[in-house]
C-alpha cells in the first residue's frame, strides 16, 4: 500500500519538476529575441555611420571637382596668355631691332674692377701698402727681447701685460720718437693708398648715379622706339638727312626739263606726258643747244664740290670740339664724384667729431677764444674769387658742380697765376705766426 500511495506523490513531484524545466526553457528561448534587438540597434548605428561617411565623401568629391575646375580655368588662362605672348613675339620679330643711342660705362667699370682685383694681389706683397704700426707696437718691438730676458718663464699674455704697464709709465719725451716714426709711416702709407682709394670710391658713387640715369634714358628711348615702330607699321624708317649738307647738283637734262615743264604744263598735259615729251625733245636736241645746259651742270658740280669740302671741314671741327667737350665733361664728372666723396667723408667726420666732442668736452671748455685762427690756403682764396665767375658762366647749377668747376679751373691754372694766391697765403701765414708768438708771450707773462 505504501508503494501505491508513494507513486502518485512521486508523479506529482516529477510533473512539478517538468513544469519547472519548461519555465527554464522559456527563459532560454527568450534570450535570442533580446540578442536580435541588440543586433538591429548596432545595424542602425552602422548604417548611420555609413550614411555620414557617404555625406563626407560627397562633400569631398564636390570640393575636388571645384578644385579641378579652378585648375582647368588657370590652365586655360595660361594658354590664352601664352598665345598672346606668341603673337607679341611674332610682332617684335617683325619689328626693327632696338638700338639705344647712348654709350654705356658698364664694360669699362667691369674692366676696372678686374684690374683692381689683380692689383690687390700685387699690393699685398708691397711693404709700402702695409698699415703702419702704432707707437706702442713699435716700442714693444724694441723692448720685447729685454722683457723676455727679465721674465723668461712669462708667456705671451704675461709679457704683453708687462709691456703695457711699462708703456703707461714712460714719459712723453721717450714716446716722442715712436710717435714721430708712426706719423711718417702713416703719411707714406696714405700717399700710396688714399688717392687710389678715394678715386675708386668716388667713381663708384658716380657710377651708381650714372647707372640710374642711363636706365631712365634707356627706358625713355625704348618707349619712343615702340611708339615709332607702331606708327611705322612694318615700313622702313626714313633716314634723317642733314639740312646743312649740300644738295647734289642736277644734270643738264634736268635743267632743260625744268625749263620746259612750265611751257608744257600750260598745254593741259599730265606729269607723265610732260616728262616723256621733255625726254624726246632732249634726245632730238643738237650738241650746240645742249652745250649751255652742260656748262650750267658743270658749274653746279664745281660749286657742290667746294661746298662739300667746307661741309667736311666743319664736320671734322665739330667732331674735334665734341671730343674736347666729352673730355671736359669726363673731367667735370670726376670732380663731381670727388665732391660727392668729400661730402660723404664730411658726414663721416662729423659723426666722429660728435663722438670725440662728447669725450673731450672738458678739454674743449678750457680752449682760449683769443687764440689766433689758422689762415685759409691758397686754393680757398682762389675759390672765393672764382665762385662768382663760375656762377655767371653756368647759372642754376648746384654747389657740388660749382666746386667741381672751381677745382678744374685751379688744376688748369698756370704756375704764375697760382703764385699770386700762394704768396697771399704765405703772407697770411706769416701774420698768423706773429700773432701766435704774441699770444704765447702774453700767456707766459700772465
Curated annotation (Swiss-Prot):
Is the keyword DNA-binding in the record?
A: yes
> Which sections of the sequence are annotated for DNA binding?
129-197, 246-312, 372-440
- Where is composition skewed (Basic and acidic residues) in this entry? 349-371
**Positions of region (Disordered):** 1-43, 110-130, 349-377
Q: What keywords are assigned to this protein?
A: DNA-binding, Nucleus, Repeat
What parts of the sequence cross the membrane?
Answer: none
Q: Which GO terms describe its cellular component?
A: nucleus
Q: Name one GO molecular function term.
A: DNA binding
**Where in the cell does this protein reside?**
Nucleus
What is the official name of this protein in its record? High mobility group B protein 13
Query: Which residue windows does the record flag with biased composition (Basic residues)?
Result: 11-22
Please give the PANTHER family that the UniProt record associates with this protein.
Answer: HIGH MOBILITY GROUP B PROTEIN 13
Signal peptide boundaries? none
The protein's matches in SMART domains, at most eight in alphabetical order, are given as: HMG
> Does the keyword field hold Disulfide bond?
no
Similarity comment: Belongs to the HMGB family.
One Pfam family named in its UniProt record: HMG_box
